[in-house]
Every structure is written in structure tokens, then in C-alpha cells.
């Protein structure tokens, strides 16, 4: 389940690639990247303890963005394939993402089993406002289709909201602070509780310099007050 991760990755890589460019070329709408992370954290939820690889390809033109992204733990404990489309106009972005978790065996996660009662897909709609004069972002998202079900098989429409503040000290030294909460009983609290803060995140991003080459890196402290857990992760980013 990867939305903001992809946006951060593209931002870090675009900065690094610009610094490494030796001549001005027409920018391609296609991109490819790879993130290596010490563990997979998303919206305050730990998806495993093993280092995880996130490959991504994307297409971006005139405000339209499409991507395919994967998440693979090196110990084989987690696999994920995400597809998404979004459109940005001025300060607003709306999009839909499909999250899919393949396993080596099993029938419920067959990719083309798309019946809402049986599918293994999780489909989410979201909207984001990113301020230009006010340095904030606000995201609201809801699972609208798929495996986000309660024990009775009913759609939970698990919803999440996040407010964040980015700050740049220099071109290669940035911090982002955010607070996120689930808005109803659902996925983020195992259908046990309504509104709760589930994600407090502080992420510092910089670049390691090797001559003319810059390697984007980040470090994150994550606190989930609802689960009473905290985590620390680091990531490296590569443009292909």
C-alpha cells in the first residue's frame, strides 16, 4: 500500500538526477526507480521486520500520473503489487490505487478474481491538497472496493486522513512531519475502534555525495499511538 512513498521517491530522485546530469535533455514522461528500506512501514503499520525492496515505474504528463510499484521483503515474508492513476490540477490531486498481495498458493488472491466478495484486491480512492503558499499537505483516503471486509463480509470503507508539514533547510536537507488517523472502524485498528491517531511520522531526507554523484537517503521515526509501538527505518533511493 504505497502512495506517498512513490511521491517522495520521485522527488528525491529528480533532485539527484538533476545534479548528476551532464547535458540538458528533453525530460521523458517515463521514470523508473528502486528503493531499499530497512523495513516496510506504511501509515504507522509494520508490514514485516525484513529489509524490503520497492521497484517502481511511472508515467507522468500534463498532470496525469500512472504507476506500477512492487514491495518485496528479502526473506520472502511479503509480496505486493500496486497500480495507480491520479490527476493533479493546481494544488489538488485525486487518484485511485489498487493494492494486491500475491502468495505462492491460495485461491483468494488470484489476480483476475474481481468479484467484490472474493477478490484479494484492495482498491482505494484518495484526494490530496498540497499547499503552495501554506506549506502543508492534507490527504483523505477510503477503501471503496475489495478485500477491506469485516468478519461478516461487509465492506468496511476503512478511511484515513493525514496532515503533513514539509520543510527544506537546503536543497539536499529536508524534513517532513505528519500526523495520520483512521476515521472509522476498519483496517487500521483491526475493526476494533473508531477514530484514533495511528501514525506520527518524522522523516529526514538528504543525499550522500560521491564526487558528482548524489545518493538520496532518508531516515524516519514512526510512532503508532493506537498500537503503542514505535519504529525507526532508513531508505536508499536509486533512479534507473
What are the roles of these predicted feature ranges?
Residues 22-73:
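Short glycine/proline- and aromatic-enriched beta-strand/turn motifs that initiate or cap beta-hairpins
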Residues 28, 49-53, 60, 77-81, ...:
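Residues that define the transmembrane beta-barrel architecture of outer-membrane proteins
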Residues 34-40, 63-74, 94-102, 109-111, ...:
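Transmembrane beta-strand segments that form the barrel wall of outer-membrane beta-barrel proteins
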Residues 113-186:
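Detector for outer-membrane/organellar transmembrane beta-barrel domains
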Residues 202, 206-208, 228-240:
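Outer-membrane beta-barrel "beta-signal"
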